[in-house]
A protein has these predicted regions:
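Glycan-recognition and catalytic cores of secretory/periplasmic carbohydrate-active enzymes
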Residues: 1-188
């Protein structure tokens, strides 16, 4: 509910000390979870579990519009680059996928691909590793047996620094590999 988080940001600006933590923890969980499309940007409709891992894969125009506004406001308040990035990527998604050639917008993107819910948004381990490598697959929370119904919903369950230490990579190097992999995965 973006309005609740907007309220927290406004309360922080009015001097309520815990309000910013309430907002940023939630914003970070949303952006790092499967609810956020880690490859193509934009938010799925909602999370189906308490870990923010598995989304209902439909993407709604109105949800994404409200979330762009929220992440821009969070960036204005905190100056955390990650919020600007999420807002930008979500706008890019909306313009690329939901805008009609004549300028209007479609109201949503269906959850089903090829007759299967989420098919377009999940990855088999082998395909993910072939394209992006094990370090990136690990950073996206993927597992050889799959983290959801035998396949992998991409999410960011661990901080980049923790994954870098686990994979013996420099955090900046891993961040670069993630960006390269996102572009390659998007082209599939």
């Amino acid at each position: 509910q973006p309005m609740t988080l907007e309220f927290c940001l406004r309360m922080h600006l009015r001097g309520t000390p815990d309000a910013l933590d309430m907002a940023t923890i939630t914003l970070d969980k949303m952006a790092g979870g499967g609810m956020y499309d880690q490859v193509g940007g934009g938010f799925h409709r909602y999370s189906t579990d308490e870990r923010w891992h598995v989304p209902h894969f439909e993407k709604m125009l109105y949800d994404n519009a409200l979330l762009v506004r929220l992440y821009v406001h969070a960036w204005q308040v905190t100056r955390f680059e990650r919020y600007r990035r999420v807002a930008t990527e979500t706008c890019e998604y909306l313009l690329r996928e939901l805008r009609h050639a004549e300028g209007a917008f479609f109201s949503s993107q269906d959850a089903d691909s090829e007759g299967v819910e989420g098919r377009f948004f999940v990855w088999p381990w082998d395909e993910l590793v072939d394209i992006a490598g094990e370090a990136v697959a690990t950073a996206f929370g993927a597992t050889p047996d799959g983290n959801w119904e035998g396949t992998n919903v991409l999410w960011r369950p661990l901080p980049l620094e923790a994954v870098a230490a686990e994979t013996d990579l420099d955090p900046e190097e891993l961040a670069g590999e993630l960006e390269t992999a996102r572009a390659e995965l998007f082209e599939i």
